C-alpha cells in the first residue's frame, strides 16, 4: 500500500487547490482506510459501496485519478481519464495502464520492482521508526511521495479544467 500519510497529504493538497476528492473502495479494509483518509476533510468524500458500473460512472466524471497498480487505474485508463498509477513491487512495463494521459510513477528502491507477493526487505531501525510497517508496506512505495505525485497530477487537472 502507498503510505496513508502520503495519501492524506495528497488529498489535503488537492483540496487546498479547490479539487474535491472522491475515495472509492472495494472491501471493508479499504473502506476503513478511506474513512481515515477523509476524516475531517469537508471536500473528501468516501463513496458508498458501488458495483463496477457505479465505479466506472464515478470515474467517467473525474478530472483525474490516482491509483496504485490495481484495476481502478486500468478502468480509469479505459475511460480515458488522466491517471497517475503508483508502482512499488510491480513493474509498470508489465502491468501499467496504457493510453493517453497515463503516467506511471515507479519506486527507485534498490530491489524494486521485485514482483514478489511477499516482501523480503529488512527495514532499518530508522525506517521502522519512520513508517508504520503495518500500513506502509512494502517500503518500496515510500519512495514516491505525495509531492512527486502532485507535481505530475496538477498539470493533468489544469488541462482537464481548461
Regions found by a protein language model. Name each.
Residues 4-93:
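Donor-binding and catalytic core of enzymes assembling or modifying cell-surface/extracellular glycoconjugates
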Residues 1:
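A short, basic/aromatic alpha-helical/loop segment that forms part
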Residues 38, 46-48, 77-161:
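Nucleotide-sugar donor-binding patch of glycosyltransferase catalytic domains
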Amino acid at each position: 500500500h502507498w503510505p496513508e500519510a502520503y495519501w492524506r497529504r495528497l488529498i489535503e493538497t488537492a483540496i487546498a487547490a479547490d479539487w474535491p476528492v472522491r475515495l472509492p473502495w472495494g472491501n471493508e479494509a479499504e473502506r476503513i482506510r478511506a474513512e481515515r483518509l477523509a476524516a475531517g476533510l469537508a471536500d473528501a468524500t468516501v463513496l458508498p459501496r458501488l458495483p463496477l458500473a457505479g465505479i466506472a460512472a464515478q470515474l467517467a466524471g473525474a478530472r483525474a485519478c490516482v491509483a496504485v497498480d490495481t484495476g481502478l487505474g486500468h478502468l480509469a485508463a479505459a475511460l480515458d481519464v488522466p491517471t497517475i498509477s503508483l508502482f512499488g513491487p510491480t513493474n509498470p512495463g508489465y502491468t501499467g495502464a496504457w493510453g493517453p494521459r497515463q503516467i506511471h510513477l515507479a519506486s527507485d528502491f534498490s530491489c524494486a520492482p521485485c514482483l514478489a507477493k511477499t516482501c523480503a526487505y529488512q527495514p532499518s531501525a530508522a525506517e521502522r521508526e519512520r513508517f508504520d510497517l503495518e500500513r506502509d508496506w512494502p517500503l518500496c512505495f515510500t519512495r514516491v511521495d505525495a509531492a512527486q505525485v502532485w507535481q505530475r497530477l496538477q498539470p493533468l487537472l489544469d488541462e482537464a479544467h481548461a
